[in-house]
Amino acid sequence: ILFLPYIFLLFQATFMRRFEEFHDKRVRIVETFEAIEKYKEEIECLILIDDYVGSGDTLLGCINLIEEKGIKKEIIKSITLVVQKSGKEAIEKYGVDLYSAIIRNKAITDNYNKEDAEKKIQQMEGISKKLKVKNKSLYLGYKKSEGLVTMIKTPNNTFPFYWYEGKRDGKFMMAPFPRRNNVGVDE
């Protein structure tokens, strides 16, 4: 999970100050588990911020690490820009509230009748085979998420034709939306 202080600073400055509940509260922006541990006695609410939640596995792993530091899950909240419906359900089933601007269904399974969905799933698996995606479990995205989203670093919950890069016929194939994080703005 990525704690995004620049987004949170904007959120704090423009939104949180409008609410009476925050007038007398100290808002800390932290990026490390060590900082969470350092201030754990003061934490009344811990807000985790991420750009995307797919299956929920990464967020649940982060929550588990935070719980190991002595923070109870009841005070943890998560805010994300985009979430897969199945990921939201997994997080909320665990007992953590998740708020998102956009909730995404599975691109095929949740948008077609069973017969049409099965055909389209086979087509998508065929595309993944042609791309020579090595891990068959990723043919429909991680945990069969069937995601249709891209960010600076495209999540592996999306269909592999978005992000998969490999060699085909001895030539390197570039993805339209790679998972590599080798291009960015330095601070």
Language model features: what each stretch is:
Residues 3-14, 61-187:
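PRPP-dependent phosphoribosyltransferase catalytic core
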Residues 4-45, 54-61:
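Short, glycine/charge-rich flexible loops or terminal/linker lids adjacent to PRPP-binding catalytic cores
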Residues 48-49:
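Generic enzyme active-site microenvironment
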Residues 52-54, 83-84:
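Short acidic/polar capping segments at secondary-structure boundaries
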